[in-house]
């Protein structure tokens, strides 16, 4: 497994792979890898000849400096996991390598609408940072496919729109959420939970599933469903942050013509902001 830290070396390797006619898959990450990331890697391996995993804690997508400062950097352990998975290439650049003149004056990519709604409304600049780094990685790696987790539902929708709008010739693969046995979605942020909070955490998925059951049973008073869910979360020990029921295809409000809904939930548990989602057929 090759570990590359500079743009010139990465370009050199990508040129070689292109000349050899290899099909390349990219898995963009911020490191601190868990089994959910490994599921992305496995999906990439099944679909391509060569798998490139990027590990970069992107300062442009953090709206709070303290979150950036405390985000775990575990490069050595990450590379050991990826080597066991027989990943071909790890791209682990420094911030200086990606943003030589800092982030303030760096050219950015913004996806109107999707970047400022829902999660974007409470985290200003976050999705601009995501679309900027992902488009830069697409330009550098030139992958045939790229794999993203469905846990970050809005991010996946944003990437799909950016790829369509910008004409990237890249297949975007959404990989289903990987969960612990008790239902908690795997996330790097789970590491912020205390042992006691970890016991409470599966309650998020239980509330999510309860909303889904109501929708599937034909209930359509969304305001009431959301209010009850928020109350349930708070009673379980969470601080409900945002609960949305949206059209799964547009992320707009659910309408009479909506075929599928996505339930998006964000809640604080101690110092960890946990997010999860679930799709529901409305037909």
Swiss-Prot record:
Residue sites binding (R)-pantoate per the record: 61, 155
Subunit note: Homodimer.
Species assigned in the record: Escherichia coli O157:H7
EC class name: ligase
Record's protein name: Pantothenate synthetase
Family the UniProt entry places it in: Belongs to the pantothenate synthetase family.
Binding residue positions for ATP: 30-37, 149-152, 186-189
InterPro entries linked: Cyt_trans-like, Pantoate_ligase, Pantoate_ligase_C, Rossmann-like_a/b/a_fold
Binding site for beta-alanine: 61
């Amino acid at each position: 497994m090759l570990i590359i830290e500079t743009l010139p070396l990465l370009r050199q390797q990508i040129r070689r792979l292109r000349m050899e006619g290899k099909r390349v898959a990219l898995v963009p990450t911020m490191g601190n890898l868990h089994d959910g990331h490994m599921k992305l890697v496995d999906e990439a391996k099944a679909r391509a000849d060569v798998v490139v995993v990027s590990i970069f804690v992107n300062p442009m997508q953090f709206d709070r400096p303290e979150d950036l400062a405390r985000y775990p950097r575990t490069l050595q352990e990450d590379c050991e996991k990826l080597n066991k998975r027989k990943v071909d290439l790890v791209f682990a650049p420094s911030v200086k390598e990606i943003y030589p003149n800092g982030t303030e004056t760096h050219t950015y990519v913004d996806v109107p609408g999707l970047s400022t709604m829902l999660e974007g409304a409470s985290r200003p600049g976050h999705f601009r940072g995501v679309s900027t780094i992902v488009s830069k990685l697409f330009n550098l790696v030139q992958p045939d496919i790229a794999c993203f987790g469905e846990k970050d539902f809005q991010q996946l929708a944003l990437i799909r729109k950016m790829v369509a709008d910008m004409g990237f010739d890249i297949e975007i693969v959404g990989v289903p959420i990987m969960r612990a046995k008790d239902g908690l979605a795997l996330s790097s942020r789970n590491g912020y939970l205390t042992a006691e909070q970890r016991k409470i955490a599966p309650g998020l998925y239980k509330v999510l599933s309860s909303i889904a059951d109501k929708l599937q049973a034909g209930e359509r008073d969304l305001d009431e469903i959301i209010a009850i869910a928020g109350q349930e979360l708070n009673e379980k020990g969470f601080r409900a942050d945002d609960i949305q029921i949206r059209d799964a295809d547009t992320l707009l409000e659910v309408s009479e013509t909506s075929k599928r809904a996505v339930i998006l939930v964000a809640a604080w548990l101690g110092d960890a902001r946990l997010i999860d989602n679930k799709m529901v057929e409305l037909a």
